[in-house]
């Protein structure tokens, strides 16, 4: 571990359309090969589809979906005396948000709809209603932590 001071967190500018910083972070994670305009068009297209389908504020639906996917607890490997234990630990808020964003994008990419905007909107609507693969991933993570609760005293 470095003894130098911790680098300061990079400030992420809010997205131009809704002025939402989390949405901007989501776009940055969705972006491939530095093509931000493509990522923006996908996200904005998905939000438009969500608005027509759900008849509700798409940014609020996005935040609901993100909160439903956000994990509270996860397991981390810890080696103790030649054995590796899966130790449940609480997830820091920044990491929980990053994991939720990553899981939503992965789940959307694995869907079968034709366009990425359609896949993303379907996954976000599912997540907002506590369904879908991203929510399943969170449930699996919580289940793993619950199953390994006996090793929680190995926390560091």
Curated annotation (Swiss-Prot):
PROSITE patterns: RIBOSOMAL_S7 (PS00052)
Family matches, as PANTHER family: RIBOSOMAL PROTEIN S7 (PTHR11205)
Species of the source: Novosphingobium aromaticivorans (strain ATCC 700278 / DSM 12444 / CCUG 56034 / CIP 105152 / NBRC 16084 / F199)
UniProt key word tRNA-binding: yes
Gene Ontology BP term (one): translation
UniProt keyword annotations, A-Z: Ribonucleoprotein, Ribosomal protein, RNA-binding, rRNA-binding, tRNA-binding
Protein name: Small ribosomal subunit protein uS7
GO cellular component: small ribosomal subunit
CDD domains to which the protein is assigned, alphabetical: uS7_Bacteria (cd14869)
A GO term for molecular function: structural constituent of ribosome
SUPFAM superfamilies in UniProt: Ribosomal protein S7
């Amino acid at each position: 571990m470095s003894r130098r001071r911790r680098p300061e967190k990079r400030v992420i500018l809010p997205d131009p359309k809704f002025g939402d910083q989390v949405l901007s972070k989501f776009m940055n994670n969705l972006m491939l090969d530095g093509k931000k305009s493509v990522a923006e068009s996908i996200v904005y297209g998905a939000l438009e589809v969500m608005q027509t389908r759900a008849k509700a504020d798409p940014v609020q639906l996005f935040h609901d979906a993100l909160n439903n996917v956000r994990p509270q607890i996860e397991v981390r490997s810890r080696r103790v005396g030649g054995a590796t234990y899966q130790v449940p630990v609480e997830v820091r808020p920044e990491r929980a948000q990053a994991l939720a964003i990553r899981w939503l994008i992965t789940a959307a990419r694995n869907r079968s709809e034709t366009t990425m905007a359609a896949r993303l909107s379907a996954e976000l609507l599912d997540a907002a209603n506590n369904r879908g693969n991203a929510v399943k991933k969170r449930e699996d993570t919580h289940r793993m932590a619950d199953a390994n609760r006996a090793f929680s005293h190995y926390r560091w």
